[in-house]
Curated annotation (Swiss-Prot):
Listed PANTHER family: 80 KDA MCM3-ASSOCIATED PROTEIN, LEUKOCYTE RECEPTOR CLUSTER MEMBER 8
Any one biological process term the GO annotation gives: alternative mRNA splicing, via spliceosome
Biased composition (Low complexity): 116-140, 516-539
Biased composition (Basic residues): 609-618
Organism, scientific name: Arabidopsis thaliana (Mouse-ear cress)
Lineage: Eukaryota, Viridiplantae, Streptophyta, Embryophyta, Tracheophyta
Compartments in which it is found: Nucleus
Record's protein name: SAC3 family protein A
Length: 1006
């Protein structure tokens, strides 16, 4: 190995050793120490070394080169002299091109180097930027783009020696893409290939029979070289002369300054190679001879504008350089290393550091480097340099960062990992002895530590969400409070066992079967639960009497204590979906024994619970019976003190008298009804009440079993009431509970009651009350026949006669339903009423057209229907003359509906006449046109006079101007009336809007 004019002999190696054939692995631990001297005295060096060699038909050639790179000037036209001088070292089996520095030997001329560059000329070149004439070739920019995979030797078209960006395998990036503006690396290659196979990174000779395949090698060790005392070299000159290329560094400065990548990935804080002007010689293990140092080269006098800063804390790295040896191939193939390089002054990686890169800490040695050493060097094999007078401290073990970087040995993207050496993990520390083949070629990323369960387990008040869901599902299956109690006990056992086994936070509660929760009946030790169970076992069919009935003497009722302790303690479970969301929020309270208390809602969840609580008990026959088995509500809890005081007063004599007086309100005032009450058995009313409550219970049970059942699925026949009451006259009372058959009249009694209403001479309010009572009895008994239609028709006629349109609408809607079911009745009569009502009052054209479309041709021939259609035509066209003619000849109850519209039609008629006629209109004409006289009384003078008076009164009431002519006839002044006519307020109008509710009639009802 030649460096700075020093000659180094390489020791022979075992050709069969794989370790000697393959490249460097920087992950091995090194131990070394340095002793430097100014003379030729050797310094001991203990550790591994590397032979980074190219293989030439089984021979190992030590192809080393070194070239300093100056910074290109601003003009970008500086021509660079050859950086290297190619020469070969003689061996028994082949020749190898060995790079040699300019500063270590005297000038001489050879056939391959006629320029004879001396040390002085080379130094002056740097100081004065002198340009030597040479043949200029353009620099191929990125001619060989490396895609990350190893390129075969046959893929490069190399006719001879060329200077270009080195392309080598084993990296993910093209080295040419990451060169900084401070310098550019270029090398001269001397490839002699017998078979015309280009070798990109080797200076070798390959016979044609080898076909460029350098995998089959023969063992041929190097020959020992005798160092020359005069610093000359015993070497043969290569037959192919080197060709020097012109380098344009400014071109690369402009090109690479456009990129955003400041430096090659993974080389942000790596050390920078430096060479000393004062080189010294020291022995290297595996080398048979020593080379004396040459101190004849002067230091450059120029100031380097750019200089990569070194970092002593970073490890030495193997630099592929411009040529790639077997070490580079084996580095890509991740094979075992043979020797390892040691650099007292760490060499710069092939990818240069950016300008802004700063070391972690500086040493005087680094400052000395920045002041003295050249910019950089490229070394194919391992060599050692140290400044004069510097003593390297003994280092027993490399840093962890060094081990990691040497192990990975790949450039990384600075955007992904800007600080590669500092981002190692514990795995990298433990695997320092592992080979490069075992470590993946990726950047190590610190993985987040998995969350520990100790955080959740440290807080005794929290439980896993899956456990809460398991508890909710378990309680959702409970149908009554007994199952809830047993489920509670079972859940406590399960949670306690899980805590003892330390599986509370590790068990998968989402998949835990609910069969583990036993729902066996648990006997409650509290006396209140025993009392409740005895009450619940009683028959629920017996219902208490109404609170308005006289109270039967018996023991005062004492409300039992709260029996649903579990419901109160754990909250009443609501299996509805909207309540399940709220219930899971408050599952944080912990029981003292097991640390488990499923409180489902912080608010009063019982208010919306599906199961109601036990209502306050009532007495019937001196025994307290449970009304239902439902849980108690908050409203009853709040009213518990009031209930107790009320029950205490219920047994007093004063309360009995009050209830007796209230019950008399429902008794008949007539003597026969009083006598009937005396003949009734003592508990007759009680039995009727029980029957009514039983019906209500059956109905509620149907809805409880399936609240979403359709109406058609309910067995209404089982709930039909058959009346037994024989009273003809009965007042109407709104139903608040299931009907009592004893108070419902059968069908024959209802027919008698209808005849009684039709023949009665009482007012409309009495008849309406009786008819509504009849309708109620028909409804609860589900009677839909001709009697039902007759009752509704009678009530509708009375409502029309009284002008009670709301009641008429109710009757008419029921009649339409009955007629649609095929029940016989006066369908055409009420069809005419419907047409008149829609035309005169609702003014709903769509409904009017729908009603007219349902009429057949035969229906339209009916007198009432034909009259209704004529009235519609008169109202639509505004023909008031035709309207009042039809009003006089209206059949059935059509005139009653028209009476409600007569006032409005007369106002429109007078308004039309006053605007269209001038100057006056006789009042006698208005009387005839507006229908103030009846048709039967037209020939009598008395009726005509009455009509005249009524007409004059109406005109004056509406603001008409009446004058008298010379003959004494009454005339309407149309001009004055057109501006003074108005619609007055009705005289019988009341504040509540229903004129039928007269004050006198209201008092008669009480």
């Amino acid at each position: 190995m030649n460096h700075g004019g020093n000659t180094q002999a390489v020791a022979p190696m075992d050709p069969n050793s794989i370790e000697n054939r393959y490249g460097v692995d920087g992950s091995q631990t090194q131990k070394y120490s340095y002793q430097y001297s100014t003379g030729s005295e050797s310094a001991p060096w203990t550790g591994h070394s590397v032979e980074n060699q190219a293989v030439e038909n089984g021979n190992y050639s030590n192809s080393n080169y070194y070239h300093p790179q100056p910074t290109g000037p601003a003009t970008g036209n500086v021509q660079e002299i050859p950086n290297t001088v190619s020469f070969t070292i003689s061996s028994t089996s082949g020749t190898a091109n060995v790079a040699q520095d300019y500063s270590g030997y005297t000038p001489y001329q050879t056939s391959s180097d006629p320029h004879n560059y001396s040390n002085t000329g080379y130094s002056n070149y740097y100081s004065g930027y002198q340009q030597q004439p040479s043949q200029s070739y353009p620099q191929p920019v990125g001619a060989y783009q490396n895609t990350g995979a190893p390129q075969p030797l046959s893929s490069f078209q190399n006719p001879g020696s060329y200077a270009g960006t080195p392309s080598y395998s084993g990296t993910y990036y093209n080295p040419a893409d990451y060169q900084t503006a401070g310098g550019y690396q270029s090398t001269n290659y001397n490839n002699q290939t017998a078979g015309s196979y280009p070798s990109t990174n080797y200076s070798n000779q390959t016979p044609a029979s080898n076909q460029g395949n350098y995998t089959d090698y023969t063992s041929n060790p190097y020959q020992n070289y005798t160092p020359d005392a005069a610093n000359t070299h015993s070497s043969t000159i290569a037959t192919t002369p080197p060709v020097h290329y012109q380098q344009n560094y400014q071109q690369w400065t402009e090109y690479y300054s456009q990129t955003e990548v400041p430096c090659a990935p993974g080389t942000e804080k790596l050390s920078t190679p430096t060479t000393s002007a004062y080189s010294q010689s020291f022995p290297v293990p595996g080398v048979t001879s020593e080379m004396p140092a040459s101190n004849s080269q002067p230091a450059p006098s120029y100031v380097q504008p750019w200089r990569p800063e070194t970092d002593s804390s970073h490890p030495p790295s193997q630099q592929p350089g411009a040529a790639v040896s077997t070490s580079n191939d084996t580095y890509w193939m991740h094979q075992a290393p043979s020797l390892q390089a040691h650099h007292p002054v760490p060499p710069q990686n092939n990818y240069q550091s950016p300008l802004e890169t700063k070391p972690l800490y500086e040493t005087p040695f680094q400052g000395h480097q920045r002041a003295t050493y050249p910019q950089e060097m490229n070394s194919q094999s391992s060599f050692h340099q140290a400044p004069l007078g510097y003593r390297q401290p003994t280092q027993t073990a490399p840093l962890v960062d060094s081990q990691r970087v040497s192990k990975v040995q790949i450039p990384t993207n600075p955007r992904i990992a800007s600080n590669l050496p500092s981002g190692f993990t514990k795995m990298d520390k433990d695997s320092t002895a592992a080979s490069a083949a075992q470590a993946p070629a990726y950047v190590s990323v610190s993985m987040p530590k998995p969350k520990d369960h100790t955080t959740a387990m440290s807080d005794p008040g929290t439980f896993p969400k899956s456990l809460r869901g398991f508890v909710e599902r378990a309680f959702a299956r409970c149908k009554d409070d007994k199952e809830k109690e047993s489920c509670e006990v079972a859940l406590r056992k399960i949670v306690k066992k899980a805590k003892e086994d330390n599986t509370l936070y590790t068990r998968d509660w989402d998949t835990e079967p609910l069969s583990t929760v036993t729902t066996t009946n648990v006997t409650n030790s509290e006396s209140s639960s025993a009392q409740l169970s005895s009450l619940q076992n009683k028959s629920p069919t017996r219902r208490p009497k109404s609170r308005w009935e006289p109270l039967v003497e018996g023991k005062p009722f004492v409300k039992p204590a709260s029996t649903f302790s579990s419901a109160v303690k754990f909250g009443v479970w609501n299996h509805q979906n909207e309540n399940n969301k709220k219930s899971s929020e408050s599952f944080q309270k912990v029981d003292a024994a097991t640390g488990f208390k499923p409180t489902y809602s912080g608010q009063n969840s019982a208010k919306k619970s599906f199961q109601r609580p036990v209502k306050r008990q009532r007495f019937s026959g001196g025994a307290a019976t449970a009304i239902d088995d439902e849980a108690s509500s908050d409203s009853d809890k709040d009213l518990t003190p009031y209930y107790s005081s009320a029950m205490a007063l219920a047994g007093s004599a004063e309360e009995k008298k009050r209830r007796d007086s209230r019950s008399k309100r429902f008794e008949k005032i007539q003597g026969h009804s009083r006598g009937n009450d005396l003949t009734k058995p003592k508990n007759a009313n009680v039995g009727n009440l029980h029957s009514r409550r039983a019906t209500a219970l059956r109905l509620s049970k149907v809805f409880d079993e399936s609240g979403s059942r359709a109406v058609e699925d309910i067995d209404w026949d089982a709930l039909t009431v058959k009346g037994t009451c024989q009273e003809i006259e009965k007042r109407y009372l709104r139903l608040t509970s299931a009907p009592d058959p004893a108070t419902v009249r059968p069908e024959d009694v209802l027919e008698k009651a209808l005849i009684m209403v039709q023949d009665s001479q009482k007012n409309y309010l009495f008849k309406c009350d009786q008819l509504k009572s009849i309708r109620q009895d028909l409804t609860v008994q589900r009677i839909h026949n001709h009697l039902t239609a007759k009752v509704y028709e009678t009530h509708a006629r009375l409502a029309l006669e009284a002008g009670d349109l709301p009641e008429y609408n109710q009757c008419l809607s029921q009649l339409k339903t009955l007629y649609a079911e095929g029940v016989e009745g006066c369908s055409l009569e009420f069809a005419a009423y419907s047409l008149l009502y829609i035309t005169l009052h609702s003014n709903n054209n769509r409904e009017l057209l729908s009603s007219m479309s349902r009429l057949s041709e035969e229906d339209k021939k009916d007198e009432a229907v034909r009259h209704a259609l004529s009235v519609r035509a008169a109202v639509t066209s505004g023909n008031y003359v035709m309207f009042f003619r039809l009003y006089k000849t209206a059949p059935n109850m059509n005139s009653c509906l028209m009476d409600l519209y007569v006032e409005k039609m007369r106002y429109k008629a007078v308004n039309f006449m006053s605007r269209s006629c001038r100057p006056t209109i006789p009042v006698s004409y208005i009387v005839q046109v507006l229908g103030f006289t009846g048709a039967a009384s037209e020939g009598t003078d008395e009726k005509e006079t009455d009509g005249m008076e009524d007409c004059l009164e109406w005109l004056k009431t509406h603001g008409a101007n009446i004058i008298t002519d010379s003959n004494g006839d009454m005339l309407l002044d149309t001009k004055a009336t057109s501006t003074s006519l108005f619609m007055p307020e009705p005289e019988d109008a009341v504040a509540h809007g229903d004129r039928n509710l007269d004050v006198n009639d209201f008092f008669t009802r009480t």
